[in-house]
Each structure stands twice: as structure tokens, then as C-alpha cells.
């Protein structure tokens, strides 16, 4: 073990915050218990105890309704903060009769991006072949320059060949003339 013990690591529990609804429910439960204890201490006179018991039963019905509502409400910080995380939504199961097989299939983000990339590449190649892109225009201009240079070189070569032929012919004529003399 290194000097000074282990490093890092989270110690302690994550904090849990109680919502205002939860605090209210706890306070009401404590008050209810206090009332019940007081009623038990006072004694159970039959005539005097009946209205209190009826009131107590009504209160307990209301508290049960409140507890049901409380269970439906979100606990902790979830009640205070609206969370809209699509990954967190539990997907409901569907019956086979409810499935829509004819509807358009939704693609994932990666698949959509891949298809868009391929389509963009195809569009670019079409425009490139038509000579409408900057790169195609530059290529065509370069090819035109090269074509002109080759034509000029071929023309010069042809002129040099003709000049050479003329020189050889004129040289032969001179020789033949000089021989004839």
C-alpha cells in the first residue's frame, strides 16, 4: 500500500434531498399519531369517544388518499426538477396488433448521417463530372493548358522535321549540282 493510504475513491453516501411534499406528509403523520395518543390517554368514554373515532376514521381516509397521491408523485428531487431524458423513458410494450409495420422505419442518428454523407458524395461526383465544381474547373483548365503545350510541341517538332528534310534535300541538291559540274 502506498504511503498515505489509498488515494481517490468516493467516500460516503450520495445525498438524498427530501421534497416539501414528503416533509408535509411526515408532519401530518406525526400530528396524527399525537392525536391518537391523546385520545387513548383521555380514556374511552363510549358517548364522547364515538364522534372522535368517526372523525379519526374520516381523517385516516383522507390521509390514505394523500398517501396514494404522494406515491403517485415523484420522490426526492425528481418532484422539484423536471427531467426530460429520452433515454430514461421506459418504453411501453406493444401488442402485435398495435405494431405498425407499414410505417416508415426510423433510422438511428449514425445511419442517417452515413446515408446523408453517401448522398452528398454522389451529388459532388455528378457535379464534378459535369465540370461544375471548383476542383473540376481547375482540372479542366490544367488539361487545356497541357493540351496547348503538347500541340505547340508537336507543331515545333513538325517544323523542325520539315526544316531538317528541307536541309537534307537542299544539301543533296547541292551535292548533286556540285557533282554534275
UniProtKB/Swiss-Prot annotation:
Compositionally biased residues, Basic and acidic residues = 30-59, 102-117, 151-167
Q: Give the sites modified to N6-acetyllysine.
A: 132, 164
Stretches assigned to coiled coil: none
Q: Which residues carry this modification: N6-methyllysine?
A: 126
Q: State whether keyword Secreted applies.
A: no
Acidic residues biased stretches: 60-69
Tell me the keywords, alphabetical order: Acetylation, Isopeptide bond, Methylation, Phosphoprotein, Ubl conjugation
**UniProt keyword annotation of Cell membrane present:** no
UniProt record, GO biological process: signal transduction
This protein's GO cellular component annotations are: cytosol; extracellular region; ficolin-1-rich granule lumen; plasma membrane
* Sites of Phosphothreonine modification: 18
Quick one: where's region Disordered?
1-117, 151-181
Covalent cross-link (Glycyl lysine isopeptide (Lys-Gly) (interchain with G-Cter in SUMO2)), residues: 52
Biased composition of type Basic residues is found at 1-14
Tell me which residues bear Phosphoserine: 19, 57, 60, 63, 176, 178
The positions making up the signal sequence are none
What is an example of a GO molecular function annotated in this UniProt entry? Answer: RNA binding
Q: Show the Pfam families listed in the entry.
A: PP28
Q: What does this protein do?
A: Enhances PDGFA-stimulated cell growth in fibroblasts, but inhibits the mitogenic effect of PDGFB.
Of which family is this protein a member? Belongs to the PDAP1 family.
Q: Which PANTHER family match?
A: 28 KDA HEAT- AND ACID-STABLE PHOSPHOPROTEIN PDGF-ASSOCIATED PROTEIN (PTHR22055)
The protein, known as: 28 kDa heat- and acid-stable phosphoprotein
What is the organism of origin for this protein?
A: Homo sapiens
**Top-down, what is the taxonomic lineage of the species of origin?**
Eukaryota, Metazoa, Chordata, Craniata, Vertebrata
Amino acid at each position: 500500500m502506498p504511503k498515505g493510504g489509498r488515494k481517490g475513491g468516493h467516500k460516503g453516501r450520495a445525498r438524498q434531498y427530501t421534497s416539501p411534499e414528503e416533509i408535509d406528509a411526515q408532519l401530518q403523520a406525526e400530528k396524527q399519531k399525537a392525536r391518537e395518543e391523546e385520545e387513548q390517554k383521555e380514556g374511552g368514554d363510549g358517548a364522547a369517544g364515538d364522534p372522535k373515532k368517526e372523525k379519526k376514521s374520516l381523517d385516516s381516509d383522507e390521509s390514505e388518499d394523500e398517501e396514494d397521491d404522494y406515491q403517485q408523485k415523484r420522490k426526492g428531487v425528481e418532484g422539484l426538477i423536471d427531467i426530460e431524458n429520452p433515454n430514461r423513458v421506459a418504453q411501453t410494450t406493444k401488442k402485435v396488433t398495435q405494431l405498425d409495420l407499414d410505417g416508415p422505419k426510423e433510422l438511428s442518428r449514425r445511419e442517417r448521417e452515413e446515408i446523408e454523407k453517401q448522398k452528398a458524395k454522389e451529388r459532388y461526383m455528378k457535379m464534378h463530372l459535369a465540370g461544375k465544381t471548383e476542383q473540376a474547373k481547375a482540372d479542366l483548365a490544367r488539361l487545356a493548358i497541357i493540351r496547348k503545350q503538347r500541340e505547340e510541341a508537336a507543331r515545333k517538332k513538325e517544323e523542325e522535321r520539315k526544316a531538317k528534310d528541307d536541309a537534307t534535300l537542299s544539301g543533296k541538291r547541292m551535292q548533286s549540282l556540285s557533282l554534275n559540274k
